[in-house]
């Protein structure tokens, strides 16, 4: 077959396959056009998941008759000058959206420019244009797309259900609405109740209101403002406290110069910043906005413009990590404070016995000569001095302790949790999780300073393991030594532990080594040295912290609270779990129906 030039209609349909993948792609392109036109309000309607109908109406600048005629031609755009490809400041710039949509659907455009006496309308069906005609419209542009992919029926087979396509449209609009809180959005359709996001005030407060409207009240309550700037690059936005996570990375919203993107570099930076706070199977919720010179970022990488490429990717990554870490450290003790409020509603008053209940029939009531102990006897046994339980006698509380962030320790329950009293309520602290974070931060600080101090064992601990595990540990001996753990091979199936970190005190060397070996088996060889060292520190901290089941004296409990107050990131342990939960007096009153 000889080489020949394809007809314009076929060329447009091929191009449409790159730009218009599904109904959500149409919505994205048209809403971006509305934003570029300076709209302050955008209304979106869809039917049949966008297959049957999509309508986008805005109050933007609109188009003149001449501009409308050109708008449906390929590569005709008002957003790009001859030599301006490296300084793109608009969401759209290729001039492909409208002709691509018109090539595969029935496209109707009605628009009015302020300089025109009335509106103009144009129709494109499968690439065939009708003449422009006068129409009625007050301001802006109204675009209707009907029978999507009628000209390319094969594409219809690859679409999902109406519900799935409608949800994809919703997600696209959510991301664009987050990027532009100054624009009001309304999303309606046959598949959903109308949703309206009112235009918010400029600045961070307005941005948080919009994010809270879209991501929910939990995000707003747990949001931490972050910001960093260097060499003309600005990173700002909001990150959720580590107590609010998801099972996947779908809760991470990233924007570059106002453009929603999915960028592996930024996602990796977010993961790195939260590495000290979250377990591996949990993901943070963030909304980050990166602003930089348009010449420093290439938005022309992907046909759908969902990917970007940075000229100085190292700077962008470092700035994101710095902004997030700084914000999380600054709000370290607040990160767990909201945990209690989210579960208050799950509490129910204890069930009361029925009115006709006979207390004498209770199994605990002594019948005849039963030797069942009385309540007083059982209570006395519970407080027996010789019993392995904490001393829970009320402790004297001074006013100054009540004013401390974590209050004054009052008691220990189940040899695991410390209950402290504050001026506004009470706090329950997980003693192991709290001390684990303290030890972890100490190890990191020692490593960054003069190295971790060691204690020499008079008699080395010999730990027997299989040969593969021994080889794995010995291969990392130099890294372990940086944390004060000095080991060496002791034959084919054993390791000798000669020194341990002083911070850990008397520790179970065998258990520590076995845990380290298990974690090392999961490491990717490409994992940076810094991340490997932090994994080692986390494992050591877990072994060197106060265990659940250990009885603490009142002075020990208070000392732990004071250390928590002085320790960065003390709201979570190294595995991402909260170290404490706060119940305010208002929360307690809700439990008892006083509020």
UniProtKB/Swiss-Prot annotation:
UniProt-listed Pfam families: DNA_mis_repair (PF01119), HATPase_c_3 (PF13589), MutL_C (PF08676)
Disulfide bridge map: none
UniProt cross-references to SMART domains, sorted A to Z: DNA_mis_repair, MutL_C
UniProt xrefs under NCBIfam families: mutl, PRK00095.2-4
Keyword match Nucleotidyltransferase: no
Gene that encodes the chain: mutL
InterPro entries, per the entry: DNA_mismatch_repair_CS, DNA_mismatch_repair_MutL, DNA_mismatch_S5_2-like, HATPase_C_sf, MutL/Mlh/PMS, MutL/Mlh/Pms-like, MutL_C, MutL_C_dimsub
Protein name: DNA mismatch repair protein MutL
Keywords per UniProt: DNA damage, DNA repair
Function: This protein is involved in the repair of mismatches in DNA. It is required for dam-dependent methyl-directed DNA mismatch repair. May act as a 'molecular matchmaker', a protein that promotes the formation of a stable complex between two or more DNA-binding proteins in an ATP-dependent manner without itself being part of a final effector complex.
Highest taxon, organism lineage: Bacteria
GO cellular component, one term: mismatch repair complex
GO function terms (MF aspect): ATP binding; ATP hydrolysis activity; ATP-dependent DNA damage sensor activity; mismatched DNA binding
GO terms under biological process: mismatch repair
Family recorded in the similarity comment: Belongs to the DNA mismatch repair MutL/HexB family.
Gene3D superfamilies per UniProt: 3.30.230.10, Histidine kinase-like ATPase, C-terminal domain (3.30.565.10), MutL, C-terminal domain, dimerisation subdomain (3.30.1540.20), MutL, C-terminal domain, regulatory subdomain (3.30.1370.100)
